[in-house]
Amino acid sequence: MRLFLARGREKSLLRRHPWIFSGAVQRLEGNASAGETIDILDSQGKWLARAAYSPESQIVARVWTFQQDEVIDSEFFVRRLQQAQSWRDWLAQRDGLNGYRLIAGESDGLPGITIDRFQNFLVLQLLSAGAEHQRAALVSALQQCYPECSIYDRSDVSVRKKEGLELTQGTVWGEMPPALLPITEHGMKLLVDIQHGHKTGFYLDQRDSRLAARNYADGRRVLNCFSYTGAFAVAALMGNCQQVISVDTSQSVLDIAKQNVELNQLDLSKAEFIRDDVFQLLRNYRAQGEKFDMIIMDPPKFVENKSQLASACRGYKDINMLAIQLLRPGGILLSFSCSGLMPTDLFQKILADAALDAGHDIQFIEQFRQAADHPVIATYPEGLYLKGFACRIM
């Protein structure tokens, strides 16, 4: 099948952006079902790209290749995997990793595909019709490149519904992952729940931020909000914090957080785990006059679509205002947003407004983004989704 773009709508493809939106389509020639590979042409019939067809999505096609002679088959996926692996090998050596993002979707030339490696388990998320259509070719390539690895599917994410796909989960090849699998980063051991954890089991993207937290933690009383399985708490303890309190609404993840502290043979008496709503707990702490020297604010995604951006801004401002009010002068706030729809400059403005409402001046002393195994290809700036700031309270 061939998809012709409306006149003038080829500009983004000429700049090698990997998405084609439904509004850019002039006409379709031939028949193709969801996920099949189609050719993209401009209004004059000039070939531009080869892409996966997603008729039920606003993103009607996602580009596999801009090379006309490149066939989308198992060997294509082998080449992409080898390109990605060479960078991860260097990172793993530098940072002491046996867990990392192997494929970061569009930024690794594989739109709609996420692959995380935890020891000898490869965890897949296939997020688009094209990715699902190529499942067999991708799995074949993974078996060829990683014969020592088991493959587990965590395509149980709601974004698949936008592509007309069912949610899937389970072992694809090899062994079932254990209930908890330890990985290492920067000398820390951290447990991963591949089967039931958030995303593919762990937030690999915050690795650099955890190292920063460790470097700031010395002698500080730390509040770790939205703690999940306590990786920031382990980092703070390894950085010789005075105390770290981890807060989450899930008791099961707090139990793993405690296990992570024990796994690293750290002082459990310096760690506290509280099951509570972060917003409410911060208000309670303010009323009680509690004070901290460092607060880590790493909430879940507040923005799923553009219509939620205004309410998300209010949520980010409120929670960061409360955090700033709980920090002593000289205290450090590490605050993050993991939503791609939240621009970095807007998030920085929200933090500035939160400080104003809190009645404090803050200094921006460091800026964060997702770790380097989550690269952002220059032609797809949307790949930058995680942003954060270290702020010092004056």
From Swiss-Prot:
GO terms for molecular function: RNA binding; rRNA (cytosine) methyltransferase activity. It catalyses: cytidine(1962) in 23S rRNA + S-adenosyl-L-methionine = 5-methylcytidine(1962) in 23S rRNA + S-adenosyl-L-homocysteine + H(+). Its main location: cytoplasm. This is Ribosomal RNA large subunit methyltransferase I. It comes from the Bacteria. Specifically methylates the cytosine at position 1962 (m5C1962) of 23S rRNA. NCBIfam families: PRK15128.1. Belongs to the methyltransferase superfamily. RlmI family. InterPro entries: PUA (IPR002478), PUA-like_sf (IPR015947), PUA_sf (IPR036974), RLMI (IPR023542), RlmI-like_PUA (IPR041532), SAM-dep_methyl-trfase (IPR019614), SAM-dependent_MTases_sf (IPR029063). Residues 1-79 form the PUA domain. Its EC number is 2.1.1.191. Gene3D superfamilies: PUA domain, RNA methyltransferase domain (HRMD) like, Vaccinia Virus protein VP39. CDD domains: AdoMet_MTases (cd02440), PUA_RlmI (cd21153), RlmI_M_like (cd11572). It is found in: Cytoplasm. SUPFAM superfamilies: PUA domain-like, S-adenosyl-L-methionine-dependent methyltransferases. Keywords: Cytoplasm, Methyltransferase, RNA-binding, rRNA processing, S-adenosyl-L-methionine, Transferase.
